[in-house]
Amino acid sequence: MPKMKTKSGAKKRFRVRPGGTVKRGQAFKRHILTKKTTKNKRQLRGSVAVHETNMGHMAQMLPGRGI
């Protein structure tokens, strides 16, 4: 049986943390920022963890990463 391949789009967008959680960037921060408030843009900074309901999809897209 051939090796399972990682989805190339997923490996560019997600990082697996040592504890097994997956880190992702925030959406809605690329363009059309003039109508967004400063508070909203500030809260969209940084990265967050992928929700546990989506971890099954992450395990399929990133095989062999200890998820």
UniProtKB/Swiss-Prot annotation:
InterPro entries attached to this UniProt entry: Ribosomal_bL35, Ribosomal_bL35-like, Ribosomal_bL35_CS, Ribosomal_bL35_sf
Recorded superkingdom: Bacteria
A single GO molecular function term of this UniProt record: structural constituent of ribosome
Record-linked PROSITE patterns: RIBOSOMAL_L35 (PS00936)
Keywords noted in UniProt: Ribonucleoprotein, Ribosomal protein
Gene Ontology cellular component list: cytosolic large ribosomal subunit
Ranges of compositional bias, category Basic residues: 1-16
GO annotation terms (biological process): translation
SUPFAM superfamilies on file: L35p-like
Region (Disordered): 1-24
PANTHER family xref list: 54S RIBOSOMAL PROTEIN BL35M (PTHR33343), LARGE RIBOSOMAL SUBUNIT PROTEIN BL35M (PTHR33343:SF1)
Assigned protein family: Belongs to the bacterial ribosomal protein bL35 family.
Protein name as catalogued: Large ribosomal subunit protein bL35
Organism of origin: Polaromonas naphthalenivorans (strain CJ2)
Gene designation per UniProt: rpmI
